[in-house]
Regions:
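A glycine-rich, often tryptophan-bearing local segment used as a flexible ligand/cofactor-contacting loop or short
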Residues: 76, 81-171
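Catalytic beta-strand/loop cores that center a nucleophilic Ser/Cys/Thr
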Residues: 34, 40, 58-59, 69-70, ...
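Short linear motifs at secondary-structure transitions and domain/linker junctions
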Residues: 17-19, 48-53, 77, 132-136, ...
Length: 206
């Protein structure tokens, strides 16, 4: 990255989902953070191992996860990944070190083990009973529960929660944000979780 407040800090973006073009959005986000604020950014993609072409529909391969060894922050925007143990270990080791994690959208269900249920990391699956709720519930606060609103049919208007308007994350953020997606439901919030926005599901996508 260029000179800026983020100089010397390394952010690794882990992408891989089929609906929201995380491979595009996170690349643009990383460029902003790198060029305007000085962060060193690495963006990793779901990739076809045979062709080397980025393909979010490939759920079993995200090359370059070793970059997490020297990461200061992991941003994960992924859905239903089932990675080889050697690759998944980098994510697990990073989290187990207690380093910060930002999960976006379907990161609550970033992992789903279907083929290799004997993997030592199968408990990270979104509906795990052994490690209740897997990565989503244990690390991000909740796993995937349901869609709130009709999936791919209804949009959302997010309203800032006045109670937390002074939260550092909310600096420069407008009071209302329109999203051309529905939202995900949660079962229960813990006392340690702060709701920064409340979602209002709209009729239609406009």
């Amino acid at each position: 990255g260029k000179e800026g407040i983020g100089s010397g800090q390394h952010i690794v973006f882990v992408t891989g989902e089929e609906y929201y073009r995380s491979e595009e959005g996170m690349s643009m986000f990383a460029k902003i953070l790198s060029q305007r604020y000085g962060y060193d950014c690495t963006v990793l993609f779901a990739t076809d191992k045979t062709t080397g072409i980025i393909n979010p529909n490939i759920s079993t391969y995200i090359p370059g996860l070793k970059a997490l060894v020297k990461a200061d922050l992991m941003v994960i925007f992924a859905r239903f990944r089932e990675l080889p143990d050697a690759d998944m270990k980098h994510i697990v080791d990073y989290v187990n070190e207690g380093k910060p994690v930002v999960g976006i959208r379907n990161a609550t269900h970033a992992f789903r083990y279907v083929k290799n249920k004997q993997s030592p990391y199968a408990e990270w699956t979104f509906n795990s009973s052994k490690w209740r709720g897997g990565f989503g519930q244990q690390i991000l606060g909740d796993t995937w529960v349901s869609h709130y609103g009709k999936f791919l049919q209804e949009a959302t208007l997010a309203h800032a929660n006045a109670k937390h308007r002074s939260h550092p994350v909310m600096q420069g953020v407008p009071d209302k944000i329109f999203c051309r997606t529905d939202v995900n439901g949660v079962n229960k919030l813990t006392p340690n979780e702060n709701v920064l926005f409340h979602a209002q599901v709209l009729s239609g996508l406009n």
